[in-house]
Amino acid sequence: AKLNQGQNFSRLMSFAMYGPKSPATNLLTEAELTNMNPQELVDRIHNQNSYKHRILYYGPSSSKDLLATINQYHQVPAVLKDIPAGNEYAYLETPVTKVLVAPYDAKQIYMAQISNLDKKYDPAIEPIRALYDEYFGGGMNSIVFQEMRETRGLAYSAWASIMPPSYLKYPYVLRTQIATQNDKMIDAVTTFNDIINNMPESEAAFKLAKDGLTNRLRTERIIKGDIIWSYINAQDLGQNVDPRIKLYNDIQNMSLKDIVDFQKQWVKGRTY
């Protein structure tokens, strides 16, 4: 992994988001693995059903038959134990801009920016956030891709997104990233920051973004086992309805001005 630029960059991103202790560092050392008793791991596997848990099922059985099968084969204690608290990794705040550099001998640089927006999940802003992402930093028709790669040739890849939390306790995070040649770094970083803060306005690009998001919502299907996970994901965010309903309905009446106003409030002038 140390010889892979992408892996090194991924660890740098984890450090930038969480600090010295992150999900990426939650690993056993070689000494800990060597000294570990294998039977302890086997016992942990055997004891998993003694903790509180949910059973997810997708298949042809009726609820009656399924419950009969579970009662017959899923052996658990009469009283289940609470799940032990796991490690918590909080996003670092970004009150001032800080630059982290990880030297790596390569022909191109990876540059990313992370800003903790310090705002919790809000279903009311999800439609405009999704449309902003589609317009500004999404696919090949987005402002970032067109400006950084197609028009100026300053990056191999470029994207930007306001990433929504997966749980209510986490904040929204603004994340941007480019990969470019070493000799284009200064121009690429300068231009990238300029379009992030002074977002170009294009009615044509907005129409492509709106139509693209609308068409994707029209044709997207959540099927089979994904239905269960979509339901659980909604529950994790305190929701009991499919968020795509509001997303689809709300974006139909949105204009480029809505995107511009959102960008000024949520993105312009951020520290990373």
Predicted features, each with a name:
Residues 112-116, 137-179:
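A structural supersecondary motif
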Residues 2, 98, 149-152, 210:
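Basic side chains
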Residues 82-143:
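His/Glu-based metal-binding/catalytic segments typifying zinc-dependent metallopeptidases
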Residues 14-15, 133, 137, 146, ...:
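Generic alpha-helical structural context detector
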Residues 20, 42, 86-89, 133-135, ...:
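Intrinsically disordered, low-complexity segments enriched in polar/charged residues with Gly/Pro
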Residues 47, 92-94, 103-105, 150-152, ...:
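A generic structural signal for short, solvent-exposed coil/turn residues
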Residues 1-83, 157-272:
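Charge-rich, well-structured scaffold segments of protease-associated domains
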